[in-house]
Design a protein with these regions (language model features):
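Extended C-terminal subregions enriched in glycine
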Residues: 363, 367, 461, 478-482, ...
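Internal maturation/activation junctions in enzymes
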Residues: 92, 244, 266, 283, ...
Length: 606
């Protein structure tokens, strides 16, 4: 049993475990972080993922540990970069399973739904909705559940972005709980050894998830905790194996305190252990860095597309680029006779817009040290989209220099996304990450937390890429700065009913942005059923490399049409996952679909 536990730990563990103090339960502490009031109840329900599923699914955990070895951006490969025998994960997609059989992955509901990568977590989130919890409650529960099971891509050692949109005329709110660099971070810290931004303690930024899912109000925490941890209800069976009791104890502490203070307090039971582990593996984070962490809460950025309001996450997420892309396509008339985005001129316009989006994204970045607000304003301006549209030809593409990228685009890594809708019409779109698989490969032996390597999403000066482009000055490392992200959690509202119509987001590194962009176009431009939006092959272009990547099983005509217009086209295995919810504005019927075809996800609803 001990050997099995050790085998699941990432390779960087603190070498001096004797210096760590065992976490002890504390009285409730006051939360210093000022997050949105609607998050107050969420933590009361969220720890359900602990014993109900997250920590007893050793088989699931070990399955993904082995299956995703050598994987980047959600794509299963061997260490030589070719598709390995582990493509069994994607067989339902690669084999073009019978469409009638696929219908079982379409969930139809009347009240609420959850769509995420892990079937058990969708079910657990839906159970929270059934018990009267809000979409935020269910989202927090789902996030912690995914982090317990799929800790290779998410967890409380990471961060992310969230969009919350209540029904009615209340505006959408954006929560930025992206990880932050510490006070001693600087732009040249990886110049001598770039690998240190990926592996070990120096790659770790201050996690943000717990700050986002907590609030200073304790309320019914004790009562809800008793329900979640009633030992008579635990779904343990003879022979069941729990691999991560230290993480269970950590989540226990957070649940009992009901606030983020227990996580970030310099004198608390968690932060000192994390700082010791980070420092013992080469890092520079301090207790003050944890104490100073805050969640940025503000209005989502919005735009109109085909008569709907699109709300998504602002800079340093890639929401401004998503809005820009929709502004570009929204100015075109729908191509005549085009039944989908995979049809001649429609595909050409889609890919050309993606190339312009790739150029614009290199100018995003947290404005902590360099103010890029004027650039962001220009990117969001419909006049900028008009200029781009006049430079898109229906007949041919151009060399990458034509699109004038200012800087090298940083290529990020894997994530987890889920979408939630409750009976009151509140929608939540949330994307979380630890960056690379198992983050920095550092796990704290006391708390059981797998720590992110989000510092790798920053740019390092002094180098040029193969295209002679410098790294983006807007994404250089600076103290307390958050790195650029491809995340674009999005909620789209029908302006007639004032109810959410489409809740969408994706996981998969640089392909997140283009996947969500294509999903919105497919659903709102071409009226594709949600099942087809999620399962159909996708196309990706990020300008550099100057290649259109086409997922397997895409019609050969798509390749032919693109090559005829001068594009270089390459086939790839499925490389991103989407989980979405669509609400019919007329009937109110809810459709929820998780990406079974790429990651075996399954939605749930009631």
């Amino acid at each position: 049993m001990a050997d099995e536990k050790q085998a699941l730990l990432p390779i960087y563990a603190a070498t001096d475990s004797t210096s760590h103090s065992k976490p002890q339960p504390q009285a409730p502490l006051e939360l210093k972080s000022k997050t949105h009031r609607m998050l107050a109840r969420g933590i009361h329900l969220a720890i359900a993922s602990l014993m109900l599923i997250g920590l007893i699914y050793g088989g699931v955990f070990s399955h993904f540990t082995s299956s995703f070895r050598g994987c980047h951006d959600g794509r299963v490969t061997s260490h030589r970069g070719v598709v390995s025998d582990r493509t069994h994960l994607f067989l339902p997609y690669l084999a073009a399973a019978d469409k009638d059989d696929d219908k079982k992955h379409l969930v139809t509901a009347k009240h609420g739904a959850v769509a995420c990568d892990v079937p058990a977590c969708s079910t657990l989130g839906t159970e929270i909705l059934k018990r009267g919890g809000s979409a935020v409650d269910a989202s927090i529960t789902t996030a912690l559940c995914i982090g317990s099971i799929n800790s290779f891509s998410s967890g409380i050692g990471g961060g992310g972005f969230m969009i919350v949109k209540p029904a009615g005329d209340e505006n959408a709110t954006a929560f930025n709980f992206r990880e932050k660099a510490g006070r001693y971070a600087h732009k040249d810290m990886y110049k001598s050894n770039p690998l240190l931004s990926k592996f070990g303690g120096l790659a770790v930024a201050v996690p943000g998830i717990i700050a986002a899912v907590s609030d200073h109000e304790h309320r019914e925490m004790r009562e809800m905790f008793d329900w979640l941890f009633d030992e008579q209800d635990l779904p343990l069976t003879p022979g069941a194996r729990a691999f991560r009791p230290n993480l269970a104890h950590t989540l226990d502490l957070i649940a009992r305190n009901g606030s983020a203070a227990v996580f970030y307090d310099p004198e608390g039971p968690i932060a000192p252990n994390l700082v010791r582990t980070v420092k013992s593996t080469g890092g520079i984070l301090t207790l003050e860095d944890f104490a100073d962490y805050d969640v940025e809460v503000g209005p989502a950025i919005t735009a109109l597309f085909r008569g709907r309001e699109v709300a998504t996450a602002p800079n340093p997420a890639s929401g401004p680029i998503l809005i820009n892309g929709l502004n570009v396509l929204g100015g075109f008339e729908k191509p005549m006779q085009a039944p989908s985005d995979f049809e001649g001129v429609a595909t050409q316009r889609l890919v050309e817009t993606m190339k312009w989006m790739g150029a614009g994204r290199s100018q995003l970045g947290d404005p902590v040290d360099i103010d890029n607000s004027a650039l962001i304003k220009e990117i969001l301006d419909p006049k900028w989209a008009d200029m781009i549209r006049t430079n898109i030809s229906d007949d041919n593409t151009h060399p990458w220099q034509f699109y004038s990228p200012a800087y090298e685009g940083k290529d990020p890594h894997g994530t987890a996304h889920f979408s939630v809708l409750d009976a009151d019409g509140m929608a939540v779109s949330m994307t979380t990450t630890v960056n690379l698989l198992f983050g920095s490969l550092v796990v704290d032996p006391v708390t059981g937390i797998v720590l992110n390597n989000e510092m790798d999403d920053f740019s390092t000066p002094g180098t040029r890429n193969a295209f002679d482009l410098e790294p983006s000055i807007y994404n250089y490392i600076a103290p307390f700065k958050r790195p650029l992200s491809s995340c674009v959690p999005t909620v789209i509202t029908d302006l007639t009913t004032q109810w959410p119509e489409f809740v969408i987001g994706a996981a998969g590194g640089s392909k997140i942005l283009t996947s969500v962009f294509q999903a919105i176009v497919r659903k709102l431009e071409y009226g594709m059923p949600l099942l087809d939006v999620v399962r159909a092959p996708r196309i990706h272009h990020q300008l550099l490399p100057d290649v259109a990547y086409l997922e397997m099983l895409a019609p050969e005509t798509v390749r032919n049409e693109l090559e005829k217009r001068g594009h270089t086209v390459k086939s790839i295995a499925p490389a991103s996952t989407m989980n979405g919810i669509y609400i019919n504005p007329v009937s109110g019927i809810i459709h929820a679909v998780s990406d079974y075809w790429r990651k075996r996800g399954q939605a749930d609803g009631y």
